[in-house]
Amino acid sequence: MNNPYLFSAILLVIAVVIYISVYISKNLERTYGKEVKTAFEREGAIESEILTQEDMNHLPKPVQKFLIHVGAVGQEKVHSFRVIANGEIKMNRDSNWAKIKIEQNNFTGSELVRLFYLRMKMFGIPIYGLHSYTDKGASMVGKFAGLFTVINAKGNEMRISDTVTLLNDMCLFAPAALIDERISWEQMDDTTVNAIFKTEYCTVTATLFFNEKNELIKFTSEDRYYIDSNGSYQKVKWTTPFSDYKEINGLLLPSYGEAIWNLPDGDYSYCKFKNIESIVYNVGQ
């Protein structure tokens, strides 16, 4: 082989390697897309219904006032919702905040599903994450440059934790979903309630705090598991304050949320959502 052909062959090999690497780097995104498609197919067609006062009669007064305040009454009941948002994440207490963009699809019909896809950069290199919660279980996969797995976690602890997170999402993004019959309630006082979310696989509890404007301002739960540096799971109190209510897709919702681990040696704030680009309800209908 003479030099021109050798050079062309090398360029061809490099091009093929780059193509394969780019294709593989999108595997996690393709997996997310397939899981979302499967969830929509399993959900099937759901008849549109309007949320009325009668649908809320079993709820504690603070929750009823919250749903009225955000404008959920008179709107469609929610069976699924898609969220696109921007924020920041902190991988550990000592790291800097990194910008993230997330897209997630949640389903709250007969089958509970939460599919959360994250994009961020570290040292200028993209990192992709997929958090999957379905009837098959819960898992979290993170890939550096979309090629090298840096996080791969799954198990019952994650399923329990993600059940709490799904309940939190319903409060933050889709308050109309709080009429779900799988949620039972205990009113503690005029501005505080406990929500007990019982699924086919587990039962979790959260406490919701409201202010005098009937806004939900804080969500706490002691049923989420924190993964320490050794990879061990331990239950730790988890708090998500909400604020800056703004109109988003016809509802008055918090535009800022934060996720905080209340660890024994001090709070660890690890995630902030500052810009919710869009929320779309009942996408498959």
What feature does the model see in each segment?
Residues 77-84, 110-117, 187-196, 217-218, ...:
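Short, hydrophobic/aromatic-rich segments at coil-to-beta transitions
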Residues 141-199:
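Flexible, processing/modification-adjacent segments and terminal tails
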Residues 20-103:
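N-terminal cleavable signal peptides for secretion/export
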Residues 1-5:
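Positively charged n-region of N-terminal signal peptides that target proteins for export
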Residues 65-148:
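N-terminal mature ectodomain segment of secretory-pathway/periplasmic proteins
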Residues 63, 67, 101-106, 133-142, ...:
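Buried hydrophobic residues that stabilize the cores of well-folded domains
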Residues 195-281:
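Gly/Pro-enriched, hydrophobic low-complexity segments
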Residues 7-23:
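Hydrophobic membrane-insertion alpha-helices, especially the h-region
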